Amino acid sequence: TQPFTLTIDYLRVRFPTTDALEIIKNVLAMKSEYFIHEDYGMFGYEEQYIYGDISVNASKDSSMGVLLELRGMGCRNLEYVLQARGIDWYYFLSSCIDYQGVFKRIDLAVNDMGGLLDIEILRERYYANKVWKRSRTHEAVDSGKLSGTHGDTAKTFYIGSKNSSIYFCLYEKEKEQKSKGIKTDIKNRFEIRLKSGK
């Protein structure tokens, strides 16, 4: 088992077209009949096509374009499609660029499989000024269930402003998932969240 893995955990891309079916067919390389059509969309769009956590939002307003959103499981769903086609994320992202996609947000996740990143120690060192830090904005969150024990509390640490174009999120993925009744091999996760405008 690798101690660390890197993955894309969230992606939002806007395309300069009003044709959502074109994006499904040519960028996602999926069949539109696999998608559920809804007469409402996210982010002010008029309609959306949904396949699990893959969402393609469309509007007749050409200035809005088509917005592709992949949440965590949507990224995993797309990875299965890419594997079946024998291609990788690099090829897919290049295809987005070929279709003049504008990347509005991308989250890169480093998965710590062995527990090498200790979130509590990282928080303590940050507060004690024992790390170089460009951003002075931070937020610490402890989450869990009231019925649980202190050991069930999952720690999250944000570095940077959530309103900026880049910020970091470090959290105890295994404990977070356990509180939801989900088993995972990922102990901790470090996310780099990059975004460009609304």
Give the role of each language-model region.
Residues 1-198:
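Structured, helix-rich domain cores that form ligand/interaction pockets
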